[in-house]
Amino acid sequence: MKVTCEVEDIMANWPKVRYAIQQASLIVPEKERDVLVYNTACEILTGHRKIWILHDGVNIKAIVGAVIQKSGGAESVPSIIISPIFGFTPMTVEDKELLKKGLMDFARNNKCNVIYGYSANPKAWVIAEKIGMTFVAKVYKWEVV
């Protein structure tokens, strides 16, 4: 399930984001809706930034942003820098696996590396822990994993 939405600032355009999620849910048969739509990480395209939203059908559980850019080195490789924005707990094991799978599938389909970035935001740390990610660098220093 892919949702695209022209949004420059996710928080400033929150009603538009919620509307995009609601519209996505309408194209799925009702009996499959909870599983197929709200328990997947919906992608909302915001310029060069990808936003994954994990929704349980009632509340949004997590929002993770990822910037796609070229990494340095001998060969410039497209990379996803994962930068969690905020999230809510609790997230189940299934939740974290779905969210992680969405990110990894996107990376594989677009031949990207995955880079984890540091954030001092306590809510960002919660997301990192819940989806099994480890921050491997501090501010402005990145490490490919």
Region locations from a protein language model:
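Conserved catalytic-core motifs of GNAT/GCN5-like acyltransferases
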Residues: T134-V145
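A short, polar/charged loop-to-alpha-helix boundary motif
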Residues: K70-P78
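A short helix-loop-beta-strand connector motif used in the catalytic cores of GNAT acetyltransferases and
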Residues: A41-I53
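Short amphipathic alpha-helix that is part of the acyltransferase structural core
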Residues: M1-V35
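Short glycine-aromatic motifs
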Residues: H48-R49, A128, G132-F135
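Membrane-anchoring hydrophobic segments
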Residues: Q23-E30, L45-H48, R108
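Conserved beta-strand in the GNAT
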Residues: I53, V58-Q69
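Acyl-donor binding region in acyl/amide transferases
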Residues: V77-I131
